[in-house]
Amino acid sequence: MKASELFFPTLREVPSEAEVLSHQLLLRAGFIRKATAGVYSYLPLANRVLKKIMNIVREEMDRAGGQEVILPIIQPAELWKKSGRWEVYGDEMFRLKDRHNRDFALGPTHEEIITTLVDADVHSYRHLPLLLYQIQNKYRDEIRPRFGLMRGREFIMKDLYSFDIDEEGLDISYHKMYEAYNRIFQRLKLQYRVVEADSGAIGGNESHEFMVLAENGEAEIVYCKNCDYGANTEKAVCSLEEPKVTEEEQLELEKVHTPGQRTIQDLVDYMNIPKEKQIKTLIYYADEELVAAIVRGDRELNEIKFKNVLGCNQLFMADETAVKQLCSAGFGSLGPVGLPLKTYIDLEVSQMKNFACGANEDDYHFINVNLGRDFTPAGINDIRNAVAGDSCPVCSAPLYSMRGIEVGHIFKLGTKYSEVLEANYLDQKGQEKPMVMGCYGIGISRTMAAAVEQSADENGIVWPLPITPFEVIIVPVNSKNEEQMQAAWSLYEEFKQEGLETIVDDRDERAGVKFKDADLIGIPLRITIGPRSLQEKQVEVKKRSDKDIELVPLDAVSSRVKLMLKEMSK
């Protein structure tokens, strides 16, 4: 292919709206262009990458027994209301009405549609198990679309749904998908880790995330080097450690004047009370009810865990106006003593004695607060974020942390949807039973962005070989030089015969511009044809991931390039 005919408008400057590396580089390298907030056009280079990702995904889904379908993007509200998720999804769901004033949604996911589809035509155990998948655009009305393809309002996903007769069958389907996902990300040549995860709005009782590792990853995961345990911080179990001081005498509750002291650090500085001897009191709306969550002063509340404990649909922090109306004190002066709310404390807080907290009065704190004597919580639960250094819940070894990007998520749904949507089958005894389901998603467009985040350098993208838009770029230094162009097209034809995906940069540009664009786009191998090397019947061969340049005789270029690509594919 000729670069002069390829639509890839590159940019020299970093676009001001691009916050993360993948967003910057995909814009600069001419892979994507923004249509509106969170919605992007995929240009030819991106389309080539996406197709390669999709092909690998399709091959592994087919290998695992999946059958591809195409499901509707526009979904009737009745199905979502029947499942109970019309309200659960809240403002994240795009909703629309037709000319008859009937409600519809742009599908953020397809559990309702696929369950109804299968229910209509599958009635016997003889037709199960069944694995159906699609690769489709999905839509979520993110409150703040950010980070390019990482958090958009329109995105490309593969989702597969499994239908089995029982939990044992689901275990088999789940294991098939678990192994298929591992093969997919291994074939994509991405460094990744599988971690336990929360099921979120999808529901279900077991799930795993496949996280591409990246320094700038959006999510933090914790893992154990001593065993196979790993989880994202939404799911990671925080184990209770034995208290260092098993017996500590309860001291008398005391109210102290703390003018202007509103933060945990303020109290450390003002009264020399360590963070570990303080608590944070956070007020939330759980649907429409105000509740309080309490964690140790040096910890962070895990909102996902807290939401799961409460079993609510919506959880969001109360504003300071609502808090002041409740207890006449603002943020930084709150505490559980006398607080007229249901209060939930983290497990760690249940071990604390003689700790400090706000007195529900501005500029005052309590010290020597004790559970039971001074307040009684509505619940004691694991509601904090796990951090590096915590004990592994499996083997008690210390946990480590790293950052990653979620690109795959698999769920055991059980009968969550089949029961409410009445997707039943007749078993061998003629008894009607609900199908047992699983759900398995991969973010296709997100995987492309994650690959950029993981491998890019200061010069641009460095594509893994399996998903690069082209394998080789041939760069004649002077496109007006007939000898250089003749050598370029001769090599191109050789590579074409060998099945290598090649592009010739025949543009009338300076050599420096061509080199910068080649690095920016991230093609694995660059062959440079210049006057000096050509005079010696040689060309320069350079890997995108290396700085070294290798001089290769013209008659050996094809074999050398094939060998280099073979080595890169290992």
Swiss-Prot record:
One of its GO terms (molecular function) is transferase activity. It catalyses: tRNA(Pro) + L-proline + ATP = L-prolyl-tRNA(Pro) + AMP + diphosphate. Its EC number is 6.1.1.15. Catalyzes the attachment of proline to tRNA(Pro) in a two-step reaction: proline is first activated by ATP to form Pro-AMP and then transferred to the acceptor end of tRNA(Pro). As ProRS can inadvertently accommodate and process non-cognate amino acids such as alanine and cysteine, to avoid such errors it has two additional distinct editing activities against alanine. One activity is designated as 'pretransfer' editing and involves the tRNA(Pro)-independent hydrolysis of activated Ala-AMP. Belongs to the class-II aminoacyl-tRNA synthetase family. ProS type 1 subfamily. NCBIfam families: PRK09194.1, proS_fam_II. This is Proline--tRNA ligase. It comes from Syntrophomonas wolfei subsp. wolfei (strain DSM 2245B / Goettingen).
